[in-house]
Amino acid sequence: MQFIIMDLEWNNAYCKKLKGYINEIIEFGACKVDKDFNVIDEFSVIVKAQVGKKLQGRVKALTHITNEDISNGVPFFKALSMFRNWVGDDENVFFSWGDGDIRTLIKNYEFFLKKNRIPFVNNYCDAQKYCQSFIPRLRLRNKSGFLPLLSSLELIRMNFRITGHLMTACLLQLV
């Protein structure tokens, strides 16, 4: 069994074809961990923007990805193929903080490949939902009712190092 902690970055862009907005993936970020949650391997690739050619200001500030990065990135089909190959064929469980990453991956898969099932994702765990089951809810919830990652870490006094993927580093400590 493989454990994959996924941290996607995306840009919300208007799509004429959809006549609405889509969260277009601009970076695949993930790491594989063993049964003791030690990092085995990491994966990261910047994706060439095909829908939104310019990043929103908050996306640039949060991710430190530039418009030049997404114009020179790997096309989505190739990035997805690289990610799929990196994941491999072993049974797996994908983790993310909240369901935003998995929903965005599904929507991009539907948009670009016209398929609604991702064959290489066998199992999925929303680490935020899992943590909400045992961390006191009233002390940590934000206005939208979600459990903020950094607040969760502070409550359980986790030490973590900030890397290119803060969420991935934090999830490794939480799980």
Model-based region annotation:
Residues 21-28, 32-63, 85-175:
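Metal-dependent phosphoesterase core characteristic of DEDDh/y 3'-5' exonuclease domains
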Residues 8-18:
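Short acidic, Gly/Ser-rich segments with clustered Asp/Glu that frequently serve as metal-coordination loops
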Residues 61-80:
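Metal-dependent phosphoesterase signature
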